[in-house]
Amino acid sequence: LIAATLVAAMGVSLLTGCGVSNKSHDNTQVGTTENSSDKAKNKEVKMHVWCSKDDVDITTQMIESFKEANKGTDFNIIIEESEDSDARNNILSNVHNGADVFPIADDQITSMVAGGALYEIEDVDAVKKADDEGAVEAATIDGKLYGYPLTADNGYFMYYNKNYFSDSDVATLDGMLDIAGANGKYLTMDWSSGWYLYSFFGNTGLDFGVNDDGVTNHCNWNAIITDIKGVDIAQAMLDIAAKPGFKNCVQDDFIAGVQDGSIIAGVSGCWNAAKIKELWGDDYGAVKLPTYTCAGQQIQMSSFKGYKYMAVNAY
């Protein structure tokens, strides 16, 4: 219960700072601490909190504020760096020794609920009142809420260096790759991740999604009777990969390339915005994903609208 109360407090703090909520929090109390703190007075309350490296400072501040608001309870809260993307594997592989409180992305919730790893949020009405409807819906399974919304920006787009690209240049992937290649530079994307590869399939009429059981999924990306076929997309990707201006790399390598000047554009998300803006300065640019050539057509690349949450270990 104490862990859930901490998460509620952290969720409200982050929402206020990150702008996820579309409603005022001035008169909303999510997860009041009165009862849980009274029971815990004069006892040591131990908690283990995970957060990403970039969020250590703000997480520490929120925990200190939580302690201040609950004087009389002896808190022993340990903060450990752990990337959001690793939460599912880390928790499900050792749920009893995992963190009590941790951040997760919306695409991890279904499997973690199926594994019995997430604590059901009790103050649902307060969360619905305070937060974005889409964020609440994405963390709700069978009418039960399993996370406090933190952000609504878990998607990706195109970063580009304005010293090389004009506003019109970034409309097509072909054009951007030609410019990168002509300058001996690279445009990058992580093709090792299905999350990013979705961008080539999302606007083609092909389909994938979660089945009614909430665990298994369906996918027809190998369809041969649709206007755009799976083999068409595969060929388009082969053509992209063959261009001198393209480089397949993970996010850390993307940032390293921006730093050394070899990368002048790349697909990533808001988590890299501050660093890229620092490096490119006035030449910093960001825009929706471009179109790409597939089966002789220009297809608009897709992205995800995703959310992040603070969740509580059910154990």
Language-model segment annotations:
Residues A3-A4, V12, T16-Q108, V287, ...:
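Conserved N-terminal structural module of periplasmic/extracytoplasmic solute-binding proteins
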Residues N76, E278-Y315:
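Extracytoplasmic/periplasmic substrate-recognition and gating elements
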Residues E80-N90, D107, K247-D260, W271:
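Short helix-initiation/N-cap motifs at beta->coil->alpha
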Residues L92-S93, N97-D100, K128-Y160, K185-M189, ...:
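A structural signal for short loop-to-beta-strand junctions that line the ligand-binding cleft
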Residues D106-Y156, S168, D174, G285-L289:
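Hinge/lid segment of periplasmic solute-binding proteins
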Residues Q108-V113, C270-D283:
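A ligand-binding cleft/hinge motif common to bilobed small-molecule-binding domains
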Residues T216-V250:
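Glycine-centered hinge/linker elements that transmit conformational signals in sensory
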